[in-house]
């Protein structure tokens, strides 16, 4: 039976220059949720007979997202490189809204928090759709998986 899913995910710790408790929590939740439920089918690897589950290592190399896809035994299957130029604005917007959200949960009213959270979800959803579009023909994935992957892409872009 095919198991077109990610069973393990890691981030290049050398890429992450700075983090705080809020960002660390976002990273943990995204990884946990991603491992629990995801759809991830690398097109070339699948055509070569690999059905998963997959191990995925994310890093940023020369300003591009590197997706190192491996089989369950950690043997390299393929390396996908995605340009991140189209993600710069959503990443910047996501960070700005997250900063507002983290400040709001400490002192704002529930309706103010809800408004900020709706904006955060909107940016997140748009970025997930963009990621699905960028992965087209390379990796088949679903919307929840793309949302969680975008969260992890953002973690890789934290500069402090």
UniProtKB/Swiss-Prot annotation:
Coiled coil: none
InterPro entries associated with the record: UCP032146
Source organism superkingdom: Bacteria
Record family assignment: Belongs to the UPF0262 family.
Matching HAMAP family: UPF0262
Protein name: UPF0262 protein ELI_10965
Natural source organism: Erythrobacter litoralis (strain HTCC2594)
Source organism phylogeny: Bacteria, Pseudomonadati, Pseudomonadota, Alphaproteobacteria, Sphingomonadales
